[in-house]
């Protein structure tokens, strides 16, 4: 379907561009949300007549988003979640979790503004893009941890999972006797030492 864009849409175009999109995308998202018009002669005339007003409204929304970006840029949100010993979360972190955490810090962010490139399913620190306006994006840090102490370590740059495995294996050494027969237990490992071996 040919449409005329009423605002800049990522990976499609800018205001006034005529683009072709799939019918379902146009009918179910772009047209109902007033982000586009069907490309026909009547709508072209309506768009050209209102172009200055549409661009002025877009500029006002962009300026408002630019002002809000200072309030959101660089914020760090900490989300405490249950996870396995390997760091796999039981579930995942959703855009709603992130938007709620940002709202608690006073940011005016809706869940539709948060752009997750891929699902967050392990503990760690992630950079998440927040699109306040089609032309204004900022980055926030999302720190997913099992406890507040762990979150503090992660914010200092410590990889908690690697550190945990290093601690577990650091003191572990295996005694190995190359001359031992298979299935034979060395006498010094038996309880009671040599007396137990002689008995």
Curated annotation (Swiss-Prot):
One of its GO terms (molecular function) is rRNA binding. PROSITE patterns: RIBOSOMAL_L9. Pfam families: Ribosomal_L9_C (PF03948), Ribosomal_L9_N (PF01281). GO terms for biological process: translation. Residues 169-199 are annotated as: Disordered. One of its GO terms (cellular component) is ribonucleoprotein complex. InterPro entries: Ribosomal_bL9, Ribosomal_bL9/RNase_H1_N, Ribosomal_bL9_bac/chp, Ribosomal_bL9_C, Ribosomal_bL9_C_sf, Ribosomal_bL9_N, Ribosomal_bL9_N_sf. Keywords: Ribonucleoprotein, Ribosomal protein, RNA-binding, rRNA-binding. NCBIfam families: L9. Belongs to the bacterial ribosomal protein bL9 family. Binds to the 23S rRNA. HAMAP family: Ribosomal_bL9. This is Large ribosomal subunit protein bL9.
């Amino acid at each position: 379907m040919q449409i005329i864009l009423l605002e800049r849409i990522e990976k499609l175009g800018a205001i006034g561009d005529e683009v072709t999109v799939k019918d379902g995308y146009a009918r179910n998202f772009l047209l109902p949300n007033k982000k586009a018009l069907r490309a026909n002669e009547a709508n072209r005339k309506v768009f050209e007549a209102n172009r200055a007003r549409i661009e002025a409204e877009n500029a006002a929304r962009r300026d408002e988003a630019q002002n809000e970006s200072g309030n959101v840029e660089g914020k760090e949100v900490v989300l405490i979640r249950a996870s396995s010993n390997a760091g796999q979360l039981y579930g995942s972190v959703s855009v709603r979790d992130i938007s709620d955490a940002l709202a608690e810090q006073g940011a005016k962010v809706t869940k539709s503004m948060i752009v997750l490139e891929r699902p967050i399913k392990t503990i760690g620190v992630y950079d998440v893009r927040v699109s306040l306006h089609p032309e204004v994006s900022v980055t926030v840090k999302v720190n997913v941890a099992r406890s507040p102490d762990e979150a503090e370590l992660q914010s200092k740059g410590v990889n908690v999972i690697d550190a945990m495995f290093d601690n577990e294996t650091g003191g572990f050494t295996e005694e190995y006797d190359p001359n031992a027969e298979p299935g034979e237990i060395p006498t010094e490992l038996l309880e009671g030492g040599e007396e137990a071996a002689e008995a």
